[in-house]
């Protein structure tokens, strides 16, 4: 993970960008820090491979979190959303969720499940 201090990114805008293979090690570290039963690296790589909507919340070059969604059959499934502890409480998860829901709607999905 980056050594960017929280004070340096306090007011930095969040960019919701595509997740890439190179992001997976950091994503796995965020996942392991947040959950008692985290997803494996293989699960994240499979999500990328099959074309799920996989996005990263990037704050000034620091990966703050991520969101993953599958879409199809008229519905969207938000499978995972996680924000690193030091970035929580600043609305980043909301921005990830809004992005995912907008993407689902643009793809013609009528229902979303979390």
Which residues does each PLM region occupy?
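A short beta-loop-alpha structural element at the N-terminal edge
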Residues: 13-26
